[in-house]
Amino acid sequence: MKVHFFTGFPGFISSQLIRSLFRNKQTQQVIAIVLTGETIKAHHEKNKIVNEFPNCSIRIVEGDITLPNLGVDNQVIEEIIPQIEVLWHLAAIYDLAVPRDIAWKVNVHGTTMVNEFVRSLPNLKRYMYFSTAYVAGTREGLLRESELIRPFGFKNYYEETKYEAELRVEDLKSEIPLTIIRPGIVRGHSETGETIKFDGPYFFLNLVERLKCLPIIPYIGQSTSTINVVPVDYILNASTFLASEQEAEGKTLHLTDPNPHPVQEVYRTMVKLVTNAYPKGRLPFAWAKLSLQIPFIRRKLGVEQETLDYLTWNATFDTTEAQKILQKGGITCPDFIQTMPKMIDFYLAHKEDTSYQIQIK
């Protein structure tokens, strides 16, 4: 059976992907590269997974994706290179507020090092690279899966460095069997609400939760945009299916919601579910943007200022290719509004646990 190699472990998506692969019997053996500072956490997560799947194994290998041979001991490298048939590259800095130098080192240089490692694998059947739908930067309108066009600008360094990284993976398509995954904004499980950190759409839950003591909670600006949020179970089901689906080889696929909801509808539903009242009035977008430039206010509200840029971004992700392939497996994206109650229940149950909250600077 194929050996799968992971970067990004013990992150939430990597850990859940491994569970999905074991559950689907797509592999019984995983090798995961882990930073030295993450080994205790990684072994803890490994033990949890192996207890769930006692016939499967996870080998933890210490390393660093920003180094040649991923910083792995030479003897270990020689041992594992012939074994790897599927490589999943998920390691990245996902913070919208990340400084450019840190994002470049991990997202761009790290991916370059992973690409070099991929080239050395004689038995590779598939390279599964996790990009983001937001490599589009400030481009608007219909964004196609087949396009990788440099935009006039980016909303943050996360977007810029993921774009640069995807360029480097795209260059491998002529020589390596690979699939590029472009997820939308990922939230917790659609059926349980489970996640391990409150970022992305959870910033707005932080805002609503911390303003609910006010007589009213206003809308933020006047937006006609949609927001593309997908549950982690859709990402897991789709990605594990695509990893063994021949038609996905050589493709770039949007794992985004083909039927996204308007920003105003999403915000209205969040406010109603948290406060049992609908938002009233309207805070001008410029005022909100200006307020979040003040660190104290950002921290008090639990919102990164870069988040606001997505409220007025008018773009639609084309999902034609992804849906065509995924329909073979009967895989569809759960509706955000219909499954939002589970997301909010989980948030409310864990909102006081600081391990879930992102440190706002």
Go through each PLM region and give its residues.
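A conserved pocket-lining segment of Rossmann-fold NAD(P)-dependent short-chain dehydrogenase/reductase
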Residues: T192, F203-V230, Y234, A238-L242
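Amphipathic terminal alpha-helices
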Residues: F12, D318-K361
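Mid/C-terminal beta-alpha module of Rossmann-like enzyme folds, strongest
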Residues: F241-E304, K324, Y347, K351, ...
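Active-site Tyr-X1-5-Lys
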Residues: G153-G184
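NAD(P)H-binding glycine-rich loop region in Rossmannoid oxidoreductase-like domains
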Residues: I58-H109, R119
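Glycine/proline-rich active-site loop of Rossmann-fold NAD(P)-dependent oxidoreductases
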Residues: T27, H189-Y202, L242-L253
